[in-house]
Swiss-Prot record:
The modification N6-(pyridoxal phosphate)lysine is found at K59. Keywords: Decarboxylase, Lyase, Phosphoprotein, Polyamine biosynthesis, Pyridoxal phosphate. This is Ornithine decarboxylase. GO terms for biological process: putrescine biosynthetic process from arginine, via ornithine. Catalyzes the first and rate-limiting step of polyamine biosynthesis that converts ornithine into putrescine, which is the precursor for the polyamines, spermidine and spermine. Polyamines are essential for cell proliferation and are implicated in cellular processes, ranging from DNA replication to apoptosis. The modification Phosphoserine is found at S293. Belongs to the Orn/Lys/Arg decarboxylase class-II family. The lineage of its organism: Eukaryota, Metazoa, Chordata, Craniata, Vertebrata. Its cofactor is pyridoxal 5'-phosphate. The record marks H187 as: Stacks against the aromatic ring of pyridoxal phosphate and stabilizes reaction intermediates. The active site is at C350 (proton donor).
Length: 450
């Protein structure tokens, strides 16, 4: 890392990068990612959910710098495939800090998990149990149960999870196969908007624990999944959710139950850390007569169509697959007398579906101007393609020196509770490209005794 002087912010770095390419024809889209924001999120997590160990959902954003940062902080990792397991283990994360949290796995990838020492994994069907039994008899299994995800933005229970009735049958089958069922997992859906969903799911998990005890299983691990917001522009704030989860955990899984509790946050850690800068590569002015608009609120005689160099086949795939609603932010402050026009923003590909914003009001911009999109860290870079030959944006990482020092303190002490609280909200930032990042060896504070 190259640390910058005190007083710089991520926005300053973004403006600096824009200035650097302003005289060039190659005004490619790029990200600025504040890794210090991830450190702050980690501190916030442990304050709000002190009993719950985070296992970061790698699928949300698999950027190596993000994974390395969380590894140093002592987080565990929720992996869904052989490739994700390889990524996490390549940076020195021990298998005890990995859960293979995909209930439907390819047989060859189950074998890879066994050969890699990854024992914790989820299942939700008899077929999956039988697939696991032969290649991975020492697996430590969590039964994934279904939840009421009707209040989630991205629903998962239609695809994954066993009902309570089916759960007993699966536990009995696992007993016959001599497999170890060590716990229960669930996921209330991504973008959960009703914290009471967690309460019901935790209650259901308690029922399954009791079933397991009746059958002689030693169940000691509860995985409460994800569904936690990663930005502040949401109706239900993070602490509003955790204030409901904590009493439910204390009620159904009190401390003396000796149950270890983990979760699978993804967007919580990375959404707000990433800001995307896109450049206007083309512009079209459409008269009101051409649009056929009779909207009385549309007082201007034209609408504007902007074409930018990233789209729904790239970073904005989150619009299609994650139900995201992105908000454009002007890079330059408009003049007081600048008028506003009805605008739409489109991606660079030849597909007519490549639309980022259907309608918004902005001052008139020109080709070469920049538009920013905040909260772009979740389910963006991980699923971006190179359709039509358009490349993925470069990522520039920033972090403050005090945040870096705090991260080292957490690593060395291994217990977050021993780290003196620090206010890192207004710390100076540093900048480095992903390829130049070096991290010390990771700690093992998130290990689960399996």
């Amino acid at each position: 890392f190259t640390f910058l002087d005190e007083g710089f912010t991520a926005k300053d770095i973004l403006d600096q990068k824009i200035n650097e390419v302003s005289s060039s024809d190659d005004k490619d889209a790029f990200y600025v990612a504040d890794l210090g924001d991830i450190v702050k999120k980690h501190m916030r997590w442990h304050k709000a959910l002190p009993r719950v160990t985070p296992f970061y959902a790698v699928k949300c954003n698999d950027s190596e710098a993000v994974v390395k940062t969380l590894a140093v902080l002592g987080a565990g990792f929720d992996c869904a495939s052989k490739t994700e397991i390889q990524l996490v283990q390549s940076i020195g994360v021990p298998p005890e800090r990995i859960i293979y949290a995909n209930p439907c796995k390819q047989l060859s990838q189950i074998k890879h998990a066994a050969n890699s020492g990854v024992r914790m994994m989820t299942f939700d069907s008899e077929v999956e149990l039988m697939k696991i039994a032969r290649p991975h008899p020492k697996a430590k299994l969590l039964l994934r149960i279904t939840t009421d995800d009707s209040k989630a933005v991205c629903r998962l229970s239609v695809k994954f999870g066993a009902t309570l009735k089916t759960s007993r049958l699966l536990l009995e089958r696992a007993k016959e196969l001599d497999l170890a069922i060590v716990g229960v997992s669930f996921h209330v859906g991504s973008g959960c908007t009703d914290p009471e969903t967690f309460v019901q799911a935790i209650s259901d998990a308690r029922c399954v624990f009791d079933m397991g005890a009746e059958l002689g299983f030693n169940m000691y691990l509860l995985d409460i999944g994800g569904g936690f917001p990663g930005s502040e522009d949401v109706k239900l704030k993070f602490e509003e959710i955790t204030s409901v989860i904590n009493p439910a955990l204390d009620k159904y899984f009190p401390l003396d139950s000796e149950v270890t509790i983990i979760a699978e946050p993804g967007r919580y850690y990375v959404a707000s850390a990433f800001t995307l800068a896109v450049n206007i590569i083309a512009k079209k002015i459409v008269s009101k007569e051409q649009t056929g608009s009779d909207d009385e609120d549309d007082v201007n005689d034209k609408t504007l169509m902007y074409y930018v160099n990233d789209g729904v086949y790239g970073s904005f795939n989150c619009i299609l697959y994650d139900h995201a609603h992105v908000k454009p932010v002007l890079q330059k402050r408009p003049k007081p007398d600048d008028g506003c026009y009805s605008c739409s923003i489109w991606g660079p590909t030849c597909d007519g579906l490549d639309r980022i914003v259907e309608r918004c009001n902005m001052p008139e911009l020109q080709v070469g101007d920049w538009i920013l999109f905040e909260n772009m860290g979740a389910y963006t870079v991980a699923a971006a393609s190179t359709f039509n030959g358009f490349q993925r944006p470069t990522i520039h990482y920033v972090m403050s020196r005090p945040a870096w020092q705090l991260m080292q303190q957490i690593k060395e002490q291994e217990f977050l509770a021993e780290v003196e609280e620090q206010d890192v909200a207004s710390l100076p930032l540093s900048c480095a490209c992903e390829s130049g990042i070096e991290y010390p060896a990771t700690c093992a504070s998130a290990s689960i005794n399996v």
